[in-house]
Regions:
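Active-site histidine-anchored catalytic micro-motif
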Residues: 1-131
Length: 132
């Protein structure tokens, strides 16, 4: 029986593509897009996506971290998942991961991951993380 994993998106570079007009990265990739880009993901697990936010990680406030922790515990208590993957920007990823480690009540696994390159950049690295 396959496990059920919930991917919770928060934004960051992992959810950005290059804007053709400005050349800068802008939020443009949904959690569904990220999940669809992982080959044969459905062979490993049943995956659902919760779009929590889509902001640069520098905007991840203590209040947002608290809300994220509460959401994960709520979904866990409801028996909605066997584990969680949180996609996050790298600027504050470690702060959020530490906060979750200290605040979560659930014993279910929570993986916090990000990317250094946007989804449309050459050798984008977000998909490689899902194969580990």
């Amino acid at each position: 029986m396959k496990k059920h994993i919930i991917v919770i998106t928060t934004g960051g570079t992992i959810a950005m593509k290059k804007d053709p007009e400005t050349g800068g990265l802008v939020p443009a990739v949904s959690g569904e897009d990220l999940a669809a880009a992982v080959p044969r993901l459905s062979d490993w697990a049943d995956v659902s996506v919760v779009e929590f936010s889509n902001v640069p990680s520098g905007w991840m406030s203590a209040e947002k971290m608290f809300d994220l922790s509460h959401l994960i515990d709520k979904l866990s208590e409801e028996g909605k998942a066997d584990g969680f993957v949180v996609t996050h920007g790298t600027d504050t990823l470690e702060e959020t991961a530490f906060f979750l480690d200290m605040s979560l009540k659930t014993e279910k696994p929570v993986c916090v991951t990000g990317a250094m390159r946007g989804a449309s950049e050459l050798s984008a690295d977000e998909i490689g993380r899902a194969h580990v």
